[in-house]
Swiss-Prot record:
CDD domains: cytochrome_b_C, Cytochrome_b_N. This is Cytochrome b. Heme b b566 binds at residues 97, 196. One of its GO terms (cellular component) is mitochondrial inner membrane. It is found in: Mitochondrion inner membrane. InterPro entries: Cyt_b/b6_C, Cyt_b/b6_C_sf, Cyt_b/b6_N, Cytb/b6-like_sf, Cytochrome_b, Cytochrome_b_C_euk/bac, Cytochrome_b_N_euk/bac, Di-haem_cyt_TM. Coiled coil: none annotated. It comes from Chaetodipus intermedius (Rock pocket mouse).
Length: 379
């Protein structure tokens, strides 16, 4: 009898994607983050669905409804903290996944890489809108400041901001539409992730050596299903420890005060995972320039395939590029730190230097390093 997974139309798709998929035999734990991102998305959609059952998207009762979830709903506090910290886990996995892609040259699969950038933008938009929903001080002022950036667009800016707000300030209309978008976007992310996977399976996975692995493939199941399962268990253990012991560590205390349009918090800042981009935005004194730099800080990822000058795909045997990569990682940590600091000396100049270094490494130094390494290897 023919095995059902090879004949049934639906099972056949699952089989080709997760069971009989030929995978390189040498991919390391850095390749675990794709499946972990899938896990994060499932956790966020599941916990978000239960939160949405009790949440009210109204300016008068939004803050109270979140308090009600934490106090009165069975395990509501747990669901709320899983969802809030799940976003942080999502971005940790996301940034590690992107870092892996840069280090090992996975960006040479252009379609997969570009769909990944779209996924990053969608995830950032979803996280931003989710942060507005509890309607605390930082929610309200974060929404006001970030949406206001669109007013820097010449000619249509102001109209665009008022159109997004649904009025002349962030109010009930804004909260309601943000809730609607925050609910629908994760499903769009899930669909886009399927496209991401589709393009990846057209070419097959990259590997740490950055060389074709057609001569040495192994089936995805049981080898990588078990390997992914180990990653899932480790991440879940760390995540639940964090949620149960330090649930408020990454949150802003200001968000425990209800939104008040008449009282501006001394330091308006987004969640930690946006701080690097926020620091780049603030490092330029001009509003429009800052917005352009903010968008480019993410869009610059799309240039990686075009700026790849090295004859080797992976950085595994390219010491200069390796050094620059880790300087870039350190630079991102510095930008994240600066994004959470007030706008005053010496933080201003540190942020500006770190922002210039960020773009310099990606646009100039890495391509030049690739050319130098070609010369060193006489390629």
């Amino acid at each position: 009898m023919t095995i059902i997974r090879k004949t049934h139309p639906l099972m056949k798709m699952v089989n080709h994607a997760f069971i009989d998929l030929p995978a390189p035999s040498n991919i390391s734990s850095w390749w675990n983050f794709g499946s972990l991102l899938g896990l994060c998305l499932i956790i966020q959609i599941a916990s978000g669905l239960f939160l949405a059952m009790h949440y009210t998207s109204d300016t008068i009762s939004a803050f109270s409804s979140v308090a009600h979830i934490c106090r009165d709903v069975n395990y509501g506090w747990l669901i709320r903290y899983i969802h809030a910290n799940g976003a942080s886990l999502f971005f940790i996995c996301l940034y590690l996944h992107i870092g892996r892609g840069i280090y090992y040259g996975s960006y040479m699969y252009k379609e997969t890489w570009n769909v990944g950038i779209v996924l990053l933008f969608l995830t950032m938009a979803t996280a931003f809108m989710g942060y507005i929903l509890p309607w605390g001080q930082m929610s309200f002022w974060g929404a006001t400041v970030i949406t206001n950036l669109l007013s820097a667009i010449p000619y249509v800016g102001t109209s665009l901001v008022e159109w997004i707000w649904g009025g002349f300030s962030v109010d009930k209309a804004t909260l309601t539409r943000f809730f609607a978008f925050h609910f629908i976007l994760p499903f769009i992310i899930a669909a886009t992730a399927m496209v991401h996977l589709l393009f990846l399976h057209e070419t097959g996975s990259n590997n740490p050596l950055g060389i074709p692995s057609n001569s040495d493939k192994i089936p995805f199941h049981p080898y990588y299903t078990l390997k992914d399962l180990l990653g899932v268990m480790i991440i879940l253990a760390l995540f639940l420890t964090f949620v149960l012991f330090f649930p408020d560590l990454l949150g802003d205390p200001d968000n425990y005060s209800p939104a008040n349009p008449l009282n501006t918090p001394p330091h308006i800042k987004p969640e930690w995972y946006f701080l690097f981009a926020y620091a780049i935005l603030r490092s330029i004194p001009n509003k429009l320039g800052g917005v352009i730099a903010l968008v480019l800080s993410i869009l610059v990822l799309a240039l990686f395939p075009l700026l790849h000058t090295a004859n080797q795909r992976s950085m595994m045997f390219r010491p200069i590029s390796q050094l620059l990569f880790w300087v870039l990682v350190s630079d991102l940590f510095i930008l994240t730190w600066i994004g959470g600091q007030p706008v005053e000396p010496p933080f201003i100049i540190i942020g500006q230097i770190a922002s210039i270094l960020y773009f310099s490494i990606i646009l100039v130094l890495l391509p030049v390093a690739g050319l130098i390494e070609n010369k060193m290897l006489k390629w």
